[in-house]
Amino acid sequence: MTLTEGQFQYMVEEMTADLIRLVMENENLSMPNAFDKVYNSCTYKNLLNPLSQLYYQSPGYVYSCLCAEA
């Protein structure tokens, strides 16, 4: 299945929101700090690459990728 640019963007935005929520809950970070952690990560850069297909994975899996960076 091929996604349109709009569909891809929607999936990335939803995954990003889930990641920020997971960072806040699991790492007890404030929202600004969680945003900073997610948006400055290699995982987020990979999420923006359609070829990585991270947007198809579960938020828990992508969060584990984010945790593995540290």
Where are the model-predicted features located?
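C-terminal alpha-helical interaction appendages
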Residues: 1-70
